[in-house]
UniProtKB/Swiss-Prot annotation:
Gene3D superfamilies for the chain: DnaJ domain, Heat shock protein DnaJ, cysteine-rich domain, Urease metallochaperone UreE, N-terminal domain
MF GO annotations: ATP binding; heat shock protein binding; unfolded protein binding; zinc ion binding
Chain coiled-coil ranges: none
One Gene Ontology term, aspect cellular component: cytoplasm
Zn finger (CR-type) location: 130-207
Gene: dnaJ
SMART domains xref list: DnaJ (SM00271)
GO biological process, one term: chaperone cofactor-dependent protein refolding
Originating species: Stenotrophomonas maltophilia (strain K279a)
PROSITE patterns assigned: DNAJ_2 (PS50076), ZF_CR (PS51188)
Protein name: Chaperone protein DnaJ
Location (main, coarse): cytoplasm
Keywords: Chaperone, Cytoplasm, DNA replication, Metal-binding, Repeat, Stress response, Zinc, Zinc-finger
Length: 374
């Protein structure tokens, strides 16, 4: 089932401010929280959906990627939480922080940078032969001024509230919960002199230009993984990956079916009746098809090995050419007269002999009406 639009999930406009997003998330989370809806699977699903939407839209970089590429930008992982999406421990920590005034943002510590999704559109020829493309993606890169530490002088201190854990335990009635430490923001460390460039984050926004080699034979839906080309990890953790999803544009001649190609070949009535040799286009140039006499529309001709070389097995698909007998148009008086003379020869048994399908069809129509009127 396709995902709902994140703005629709939170009930806000695409121009919503950060404050409007936060208020909408709070309302959504309070309404669907599992503790308020015990045993309600639909409410739990809505709660997760709300959490996922807010994680993306509350992050400026992720929001820009979502506005540009939609859900495809995050199919291999969201935020710093890894490719599996948010788990219930993180969700409970975040929501209770919001409900009880502890602030947003879960207590988790990211183990790596976020993965990035990018959609690359290719022509069929590029997908079949392979291509190298330069792309530009918005991302978070390690701050060069502080080498990713977030500290102007490189010094950090262990938080004296959470003692480096990044989380604190709170008791609310019968509930014991963990949430991000308010003193260090969940990092477990205090930066006395934040870097002036990244403001203590250790990462800065930048547009990265990359060269992507697309192998021959890719098709719509195939993904190319560029390891380590995702967002820089916080506090020196490894970067995420970049996933390039391929989308192949429709072609004017060929339709692709896996490694096979299909096309239509129009021929004249005279060619269909008398037979002929016609030239057809293939990905490797032209080829010839011998049309036997009395060929009908719909007949398939198979050209082995003229399809697409598989990106996985390296075997080659086939090209299937479907003949379409074209009715002549814009006839000259002489051509019309010749056709009228030709049609006049189709009388009695001669018509049945030369057009068996037409005769069989008319017999069927006559039999149908006889049965209907008897």
């Amino acid at each position: 089932m396709s995902k709902r639009d994140y703005y629709e999930v939170l009930g806000v406009a695409r121009t919503a401010t950060d404050d409007e997003l936060k208020k909408a998330y709070r309302r959504c989370a309070m309404k669907f929280h599992p503790d308020r809806n015990p045993g309600d699977a639909a409410a739990e699903a809505s709660f997760k959906e709300c959490k996922e939407a807010y994680e993306v839209l509350s992050d400026g970089n992720k929001r820009r990627m979502y506005d540009s590429h939609g859900h495809a930008a995050f199919e291999h992982g969201m935020g710093g939480g890894g490719p599996g999406g948010p788990d219930m421990n993180d969700i409970f920590g975040d929501i209770f922080g919001n409900i009880f005034g502890g602030g947003g943002g879960g207590p988790r510590q990211a183990r790596r940078g976020a993965d990035i999704g990018y959609v690359m559109e290719l022509d069929l020829e590029e997908a079949v032969r392979g291509v190298e493309r330069r792309i530009e993606i918005p991302t978070l890169a390690e701050c060069g001024d502080c080498d990713g530490s977030g500290s102007e002088d490189g010094k950090v201190e262990t938080c004296n509230v959470c003692h480096g854990r990044g989380q604190v335990r709170i008791q609310r009635g019968i509930f014991a919960m963990q949430q991000a430490c308010h003193n260090c923001g969940g990092r477990g460390q205090i930066i006395a002199k934040p870097c002036k460039t990244c403001h203590g984050n250790g990462r800065v926004e930048e547009d990265k230009v990359l060269s992507v080699k697309v192998p021959a034979g890719v098709d719509t839906g195939d993904r190319i993984r560029l390891q380590g080309e995702g967002e820089a990890g916080p506090a020196g953790t490894p970067p995420g990956d970049l996933y390039v999803e391929v989308r192949v544009r429709e072609h004017a001649i060929f339709q692709r079916d896996g490694d096979d190609l299909h096309c239509e070949v129009p021929i004249r009535i005279s060619q269909a009746a008398l037979g002929d040799t016609v030239r057809v286009a293939t990905l490797g140039g032209e080829a010839e098809i011998r049309i036997p006499a009395e060929t009908q529309t719909g007949k398939l001709f198979r050209l082995r090995g003229k399809g697409v070389r598989s990106v996985r097995s390296r075997s080659e698909g086939d090209l299937y050419c479907r003949v379409v007998v074209e009715t002549p148009v814009n006839l000259t008086p002489e051509q019309r007269k010749l056709l009228e003379q030709f049609e006049a020869t189709f009388v009695g048994e001669e018509a049945r002999k030369h057009s068996p399908k037409s005769a069989t069809f008319m017999d069927g129509v006559k039999g149908f009406w006889d049965r209907m009127t008897s």
